[in-house]
Amino acid sequence: CYLLDEARLRRNGEILLGVQQRTSCKILLAQKAFSNFDLYPLLAPCLAGTEASGLYESRLGKEELPEKENHVFCAAYRVDEFNELLDYADHIVFNSPAQLAKFGPAAKAAGKSVGLRINPERSTQEGHAIYDPCAPGSRLGTTRAQWDAALAKQPGLAALLDGLHFHTLCEQDADALAVTLDAVEEKFGDLLPGLKWLNFGGGHHITRPGYDLATLEACIARMQEKYGVQVYLEPGEAWALNAGYLVTTVLDTLQNGDTSLAILDMSAACHTPDVIEMPYRPPLLDAGEPGEKPCTCLLYTSDA
């Protein structure tokens, strides 16, 4: 079963609320990372709104937190869903100039705040380029060259924009954000004056012990004061970091040659899909690295 630690969730929320109070930034809940809406009331006093990755997350945010801001980003929107999305979202971010041209006018006509996801082309990650939004050939975000080429053909695109959005981090500290902001200013700084907001995206491990809050807050202040924009952040994991547990049972133990194995009463595909997709090793209570403890054991789930 899953266990959620309400005290830890509340503490995470308090940390994020403190950042907002000290800097006047706004922090959203990225629902793709945590969408247990039974606990939204607990987090509600600490968040400015929700971030959705599509129609149904946006609807969830609207239904559960109707008084909060509702932001959405999707790599590509569906024509048959977009009108319904306008009923829920108040901030809509597009991934490409083509999507901005296709849906931006309708979003503006409906009174929505419109943004473009940018790619600052400055990677701060190593070892998993397939998930790095700044990796060569990335599908996520618009490079400056792509923007300039689109604007040359459709000069009216710039008038649709209220803000810019980037999301380049993954479980990282504020030093990576500072590096990213240098690239954002270098590539897109001339677009920021006159815009209303700048969204720093997610991947900020703000509630992790030892996270550099001072550098984060300096980064926020730097952009708000220099460009007069409202800064948003949309962490997901930071809201629920270290506040959830998967509790399972050992059903059987095996010995195959020199290898010790344990079969668990759980499904990797259903309960911990990141283990398969990433790959990812979740922290295990009282466990260590291979050879560190008296027994080294491979854990397997009971599904075939």
Residue ranges with predicted function:
Residues 5-8:
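A structural motif shared across PLP-dependent enzymes of the aminotransferase-like
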Residues 12-20:
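A short, N-terminal amphipathic alpha-helix
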Residues 25-197, 219-222, 263:
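Active-site-proximal beta-alpha core segment in soluble small-molecule metabolic enzymes
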Residues 122-124, 170, 206, 239, ...:
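Feature marks short, surface-exposed loop/turn motifs that line or immediately flank catalytic pockets
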Residues 128-134, 210-224, 228-288:
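Active-site loop ensemble at the mouth of alpha/beta enzyme cores that anchors a bound cofactor
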Residues 168-169, 198-207, 235-237:
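Glycine-rich beta-strand-to-loop/alpha-helix junction loops that act as flexible
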Residues 300-304:
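Conserved small/polar residues in nucleotide/adenosyl-binding loops
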